[in-house]
Regions:
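Acyl-donor-binding surface of acyltransferase catalytic domains
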Residues: 1-54, 175-176
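Short amphipathic alpha-helix that is part of the acyltransferase structural core
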Residues: 46-78
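Conserved acetyl-CoA-binding loop-helix of GNAT-fold acetyltransferases
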Residues: 1-5, 124-140, 155-159, 163
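A conserved beta-strand-loop-helix scaffold within acyl/acetyltransferase catalytic domains
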Residues: 80-120
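Conserved active-site alpha-helix within GNAT-family acetyltransferase domains
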Residues: 21-33, 152-170
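Residue-level recognition of the GNAT/N-acetyltransferase active site
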Residues: 119, 123, 151
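Residue-level detector of high-confidence beta-strand sites
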Residues: 104, 129, 169-174
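Conserved GNAT acetyl-CoA-binding A-motif
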Residues: 9-20, 139-151
Length: 178
């Protein structure tokens, strides 16, 4: 069971991802929660057709990690090193306008699509949807499942993924123990 596994694991890390509510009492048996980020997981079924984006995007380079971090709303939950690692390990997409990176998306270490962000002055132009379409197509070309984790109050992102045909799966959390 999970309790036995954690005892053998010896809490070598205090960070846990994809935690379901039933797991929390086991995780917190000897530790308190320092922070918890709760999200809803949505999947995109393989049968759902996704048209390619109308706007050209291209993969991001590891050197862009600091820029992405500086413009992230999740600096408390991530690091430049983590972003750099994700850029190296999996798919990413960026949109440049007049030489400026104005929107991007990449994946988390559970391979979920994430970090979707458009600079405020460029929002409302459909760039987020175009980035998401580009990421979905890249994941499918690699034969990988497509899923996202979104905070329940992020209605704009939820509306976007529902528009593209994602289906709710479950509530999960990222947890850091203290």
């Amino acid at each position: 069971d999970l309790f036995t596994l954690l005892e053998e694991f010896r809490y070598e890390t205090l960070y846990f991802a994809n935690v379901e509510e039933w797991m929390l009492p086991v995780l917190t048996h000897r530790h308190k929660i320092e922070w918890k980020l709760t999200t809803h997981r949505y999947y995109l079924l393989w049968e759902r057709q996704i048209d390619p984006p109308l706007f050209e995007s291209r993969p991001l380079e590891e050197s862009m990690a600091s820029y992405i971090y500086d413009h992230s709303a999740y600096r408390d939950f991530t690091s430049i090193q983590y972003i750099r690692e994700r850029l190296k390990m999996d798919v990413s997409a960026g949109i440049w306008i007049d030489g400026e990176l104005v929107g991007w998306g990449l994946t988390h270490d559970d391979t979920s699509l994430g970090f979707l962000n458009v600079i405020p002055g460029y929002r409302g132009q459909g760039l987020g949807e175009r980035l998401l379409r580009a990421l979905i197509i890249q994941k499918r070309q690699k034969g990988m499942s497509v899923f996202v984790n979104i905070e329940p109050h992020n209605h704009q992102s939820i509306n976007l993924i529902r528009k593209l045909g994602f289906t709710f799966d479950r509530e999960i959390s990222w947890v850091k123990l203290g």
